[in-house]
From Swiss-Prot:
<feature type="signal peptide">
    <location>
        <begin position="1"/>
        <end position="23"/>
    </location>
</feature>
<feature type="glycosylation site" description="N-linked (GlcNAc...) asparagine">
    <location>
        <position position="163"/>
    </location>
</feature>
<dbReference type="InterPro" id="IPR000985">
    <property type="entry name" value="Lectin_LegA_CS"/>
</dbReference>
<dbReference type="InterPro" id="IPR001220">
    <property type="entry name" value="Legume_lectin_dom"/>
</dbReference>
<feature type="glycosylation site" description="N-linked (GlcNAc...) asparagine">
    <location>
        <position position="88"/>
    </location>
</feature>
<comment type="subunit">
    <text>Heterodimer of chain 1 and chain 2.</text>
</comment>
<protein>
    <recommendedName>
        <fullName>Alpha-amylase inhibitor 1</fullName>
    </recommendedName>
</protein>
<dbReference type="InterPro" id="IPR019825">
    <property type="entry name" value="Lectin_legB_Mn/Ca_BS"/>
</dbReference>
<comment type="function">
    <text>Lectin and alpha-amylase inhibitor. Acts as a defensive protein against insects.</text>
</comment>
<feature type="propeptide">
    <location>
        <begin position="240"/>
        <end position="246"/>
    </location>
</feature>
<dbReference type="GO" id="GO:0015066">
    <property type="term" value="F:alpha-amylase inhibitor activity"/>
</dbReference>
<keyword id="KW-0732">Signal</keyword>
<keyword id="KW-0325">Glycoprotein</keyword>
<dbReference type="Pfam" id="PF00139">
    <property type="entry name" value="Lectin_legB"/>
</dbReference>
<keyword id="KW-0430">Lectin</keyword>
<keyword id="KW-0022">Alpha-amylase inhibitor</keyword>
<dbReference type="GO" id="GO:0030246">
    <property type="term" value="F:carbohydrate binding"/>
</dbReference>
Length: 246
């Protein structure tokens, strides 16, 4: 009787711990048309009448940021696990000068609060330095050259992925109209760079000079995160532990 009670107590404690460990929040959304309820708009960012996210005005010295309306969990401090994520968006950058003009458009993961622990992770589509780069806390980790004029005024498809198992951070940019593409990938240990919750979105600046401004639109956006390691490892461990308990 005492042995049976001990087993039941062990099982109850294990299930309680497992329930706590499963508390990581996964996120998935698809936005085909933006509105002010699914975004947090800052600076000059606005939503057009046809549902496009406009990150800069049709003029110089315009700066803005736009984030998904809810924070997203990227790391689980209880386990130390980091989510894998996959995000896709369609963007349109239009320059108004043949030479390098403004700064470009960034995809960003930033701490929910400025004083929060964790760095900013950025994918830069830099039109001034003509490069696509993966940055952590303003440090260029990996970059490749690109020519914005291969995409100028045309809808470009972007895919950004992070695999928490391999720690590979990948970026691909393509122009369906011309077949042009650019790709960059590198290893990033996100568990050392980010804290649990981040704001995910975009930032852009149109340029400091009237003769060299550019506009930046995002037409659609999808995002999904999953604690792959967390679930797979727990499922395997739970079966082993339950067998031992029972």
């Amino acid at each position: 009787m005492i042995m049976a009670s001990s087993k039941l107590l062990s099982l109850a404690l294990f299930l309680a711990l497992l329930s706590h460990a499963n508390s990581a929040t996964e996120t998935s959304f698809i936005i085909d048309a933006f509105n002010k309820t699914n975004l947090i708009l800052q600076g000059d960012a606005t939503v057009s009448s046809n549902g496009n996210l406009q990150l800069s005005y049709n003029s110089y010295d315009s700066m803005s940021r736009a984030f998904y309306s809810a924070p997203i969990q990227i790391r689980d401090s209880t386990t130390g696990n980091v989510a894998s994520f996959d995000t896709n968006f369609t963007m349109n950058i239009r320059t108004h000068r043949q030479a390098n003009s403004a700064v470009g458009l960034d995809f960003v993961l930033v701490p929910v609060q400025p004083e929060s622990k964790g760095d900013t992770v950025t994918v830069e589509f830099d039109t001034f330095l003509s490069r696509i780069s993966i940055d952590v806390n303003n440090n260029d980790i990996k970059s490749v050259p690109w020519d914005v004029h291969d995409y100028d005024g045309q809808n470009a498809e972007v895919r950004i992925t992070y695999n928490s198992s391999t720690k590979v951070f990948s970026v691909s940019l393509s122009n369906p109209s011309t077949g042009k593409s650019n790709n960059v990938s590198t290893t990033v240990e996100l568990e050392k760079e980010v804290y649990d919750w981040v704001s995910v979105g975009f930032s852009a600046t149109s340029g400091a000079y009237q003769w060299s401004y550019e506009t930046h639109d995002v037409l659609s956006w999808s995002f999904s995160s999953k604690f792959i390691n967390l679930k797979d490892q727990k499922s395997e461990r739970s079966n082993i532990v339950l067998n031992k308990i029972l």
